[in-house]
Amino acid sequence: MNPVRNLVPEIRAFRPFLPAKDYETSLRFYKAIGFKAYPLGDTMAELSLGPHAFLLQGYYVKEWADNMMTHVLVEDVDMWWRHIDSLDLTNQFGISPPSAPRGEPWGLTVAYITDPSGVLWHFAETTKLDGKKP
């Protein structure tokens, strides 16, 4: 028996709020990547990939957006990279070019993408300490 389970009620979902400087542009950006959007009002939507989701809101604070990072652990970061690279996100949305996957010292291979509001996304895959995929 898990003693923590007895003390803390279980949760059904964990969905962070992400800022959108221009809500419609951000919504199109995430849809282009492959997120499904479920509107929750004029300037809020739940965006999901499978069972994982976040809430996009039409609210923006530069300091928050520029310091926000989101981590997505995937099975095959190279496959994700080919998908992301094929979308030409820089020309479509005026963002900095996404960074191709690279091995990081903390044991992950990570591709980096910055959304139109400045939120940094890490698409990552676990690697062995020798830098090779398991």
Q: Model features per residue range: what roles?
A:
Residues 1-25, 70, 126-134:
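N-terminal beta-strand motif that seeds the catalytic metal site of vicinal oxygen chelate
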Residues 9-12, 62-67, 104-105:
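Short glycine-enriched loop/turn motifs at secondary-structure junctions
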